[in-house]
Amino acid sequence: MKNFGQGFTLIELLVVIAIIGILAAVALPLYKGYTVMAKLSEVENAMSTVASGVTAFYQDENSWPDCPTVIEVGSSLGVSLGAVLRISQISVSGVDGMITVSVQNIDSMVDGKTLTLSPTPIADGSLIWDWGWSADFPPQFRPKSGR
């Protein structure tokens, strides 16, 4: 009987390397998408905080706050956004209460794009909020309620 050497052949190693390459090619884009969505959730949470302040202002004053800068958003609405690094600009329109945010430091696919949160008053004095976005905002990264 012949004694065969122990170990893997070159073909077997190449097959394993090819399989690992295919798995990496599938996994990396998925991972990137999940990290973008996680970073965008910070922006969505900040916008929801501002929406709570706008709701309270509207219910107290029966008008919309006019806050064109992040400083005025914080002082006029009494909300603290903390250090939200993903927002380059946030404002609240005094005309219709729309919250507008420009995102940054997330990914080239969404940086510079705009998200909006628009209120609709209902009879009992509360507000219904609807998400919006700029036309070039990638569909896979839009807020869940707006997909």
For each predicted feature, which ranges?
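A general marker of short, structured functional hotspots
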Residues: F4, A27-L30, G53-V54, G125-L127, ...
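Periplasmic/extracellular, small/polar-rich flexible segments of pilin-like filament-forming proteins
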Residues: Q59-R147
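Conserved hydrophobic/amphipathic alpha-helical signal-anchor segments
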Residues: G33-V73
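N-terminal single-pass transmembrane signal-anchor helix
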Residues: M1-V36, E42, A46, V50
